[in-house]
Amino acid sequence: MSSHITLIKTNTNNENKMTQFNYKVDNDVMIIRAMVNNVAKQMTPVWPLEKFIACNALHGFESMSFEEAVIQNQTAKKGTPFNEKLERVNWHMIKWCGSFLDIGQGTLEMPHRDKGLYFGFLKLAPFDSALHQNSKSIKSWLSNLPEMPEQAIRLCLDKLGVLNQKQEDFLQSTLSHLPGWAGYIKWISEWKNRNGKEENPVSLVDFIAVRLVITCILWPEASQEEKKKKKDSADTKQLIQNIKNKEDDYRQLLLKKLLPELSKAHIKENRANAQMVFCIDVRSEPFRRCIEKLGHYETLGFAGFFGLPVSIKDYDGETIKDSCPVLLKPRFNIHEKAIAANEHCLEHHEKGKEFKNILNRVYQQLKYNFSTPFALVESLGIWCGITMFLKSCSPIFARRLTKDLNEMICPSIQTQPVFELDLLEKEVGISLQEQIAYAEMALRLMGLTDNFAKLVIFCGHGSSTQNNPYASALDCGACGGNQGGKNAQLLASILNKIIVRRALAENGINIPQDTLFYGAQHDTTTDEVEIYHSNVSQFIHQDILDQLRTDLNMAKHNNNLERINYLNSIDCAEKDIARRSTDWSETRPEWGLARNAAFIVAPRQLTKNINLEGRCFLHSYDWSQDKDGALLETILTAPMVVAQWINTQYLFSTIDNVAYGSGSKITHNVAGKIGVMQGNASDLMHGLPLQSVMSHDDKSFHEPQRLLTIVYAPREIISELVEKHDVLKTLFFNEWVHLVAIDPRSHLFYKLEKTNNWSVIQ
């Protein structure tokens, strides 16, 4: 069976001419598409550097048990012999992918990008002498390739002599040679393009078609290559056993710490002076301990996007950033507006911004143009030399000087989110009813429905580093690799509205009239906390706010002392940590989420008196306020899944940093502003760098182990939720995540086995 699509185009002049285009969409094409879809299921998407998202390197193998997936992949990746022809194919493929996918680093844009990768290759390959070596027969063959990539794949499979029953395996192998570039294309087609058509369309069908054409030219006997004998999996089994031993030891230690807290009577405390809601990020845990010790403060844990699926356009930015988990699609567009002390300040800022933008554009054009970089160096060499000297010898002073110059040229101004629904521009803003609904859901999910403090601070987080392509990996994963302060500011602004509070009161959430909500941001590199004022129209409790600022500075100092022990520094804690955030040669500004091990869903009282060593994601939850399990359902299917992605990324980047990580930062090259390569031509690296998980070349800092999820709730509620969601059954029964329930009534620990039975942990 086959179908034909015929398009008839009639000339506008009087000539009776007709151009007919025939595109044959036959069974072969559909079969090729189906095969590509099947092999793509095992590919892990690779996010770009600007929104570097943690992802399980073996995400496509989660239908297997953890052990099976690791054994299969470790065995396949180890012991691959060097193949010169394969390396040549890879080199050409990297060249074409880098040119097509570039987003601004290259001087000249690849022609025909708007028609797709395969189409562009089809038109340009005959001019690539490095590929065809000026062979007339190869050039002729290239010029006569079919226009549909599926047809090109069929042609190449036949030319390479791949048997029908082995074609899918061959395509799988084709993708596996450059999983980074293929994974990035998968991200474009399956994640980025969810919101609309891509300007430069590309798919894995294009990728495979181009690669097979190159393979036909450079490695025609590829299908005849003997498969290497699989290595004995004994080493991998020993690796898995070591992981299990670490998991058992850690679970025993953690449950031993929690056990005494279960028997304590948790009396509801008097009204706190301030409540601070932090992201569940493991880096928040030690800081929460520090601030709680300094005053009558209460802290809670909640996903750092604060329940708001928004896209935000910064006031001074040109791009719109999705500030929510990648599992969600943004529902609302939010813009920022300036709040200047007077018209003169705003005018000064705008003129300074325009001047800086002009300088930046000129500099970028001179830097990336193929004919001007040397002239740029000659003209600015002395100033660049001075800058390099200051940045290298005194990074803190250089940062302060740069900040002062920026303030002189373009003085900073306060901004606030514009979130009211714009009747003239309906794509911007959130309706009142939706503001109320999202505010209520956020408060219920974080367990903050009564006993409000006088000050409630929603504290997002971000990092501050220099010369760091992986900067977004240190920002908030729940905000899509962006900083979370603006989400915090937005929720605070909504909850400060009287009309929203009245509606919440009708739904049983009574917020005292003297309670004020503030947005804030925790810098995880330096531990500084900035509290925003633009969302507050009245200033009361100034004494509490001043004391809180003082205590936050002390908490910063205390947490710096705790963190410096892991950074192997002999300098003053605060001085060294400040240097790390400003030093452009620093390969490890902070440890990020290294050593993450557990995800605890429970009231803060259960963990408040325990030093969890910055290894636990903490999500506030009170099962007594969630009889139907709806809140727990959201927590397990959203924040916990994100935590599992983070955990597995750190795990696999540690056990094999070459295969699953990105190697040393020292030899990184940024490719097309989308990712990094090792050297000048490698696969697009898709995991964490060596310095993020290893304290030395041969000693890991991160302890590779699967995520341990601990839920303080009755087993029957948890079991119902697991049965309801395939993603939970996959993670728990295939043992990608371990689940322990703490019975609130008997205080016994239960482990969910892969057989879907609960066993008591003694």
From Swiss-Prot:
Q: What is this protein called?
A: Probable inorganic carbon transporter subunit DabA
The entry's keywords:
Cell inner membrane, Cell membrane, Membrane, Metal-binding, Transport, Zinc
Classification of source organism: Bacteria, Pseudomonadati, Pseudomonadota, Gammaproteobacteria, Legionellales
Q: How does it assemble?
A: Forms a complex with DabB.
Q: Which Pfam families match?
A: DabA
Name one molecular function that GO assigns to this entry. Answer: zinc ion binding
Q: Does the keyword Cytoplasm apply?
A: no
Identify which cofactors the protein needs according to its UniProt entry.
Answer: Zn(2+)
| Family affiliation | Belongs to the inorganic carbon transporter (TC 9.A.2) DabA family.
Tell me where it mainly resides. membrane
Q: What does this protein do?
A: Part of an energy-coupled inorganic carbon pump.
GO cellular component terms, semicolon-separated: plasma membrane
**Record flagged with keyword Nucleotide-binding:** no
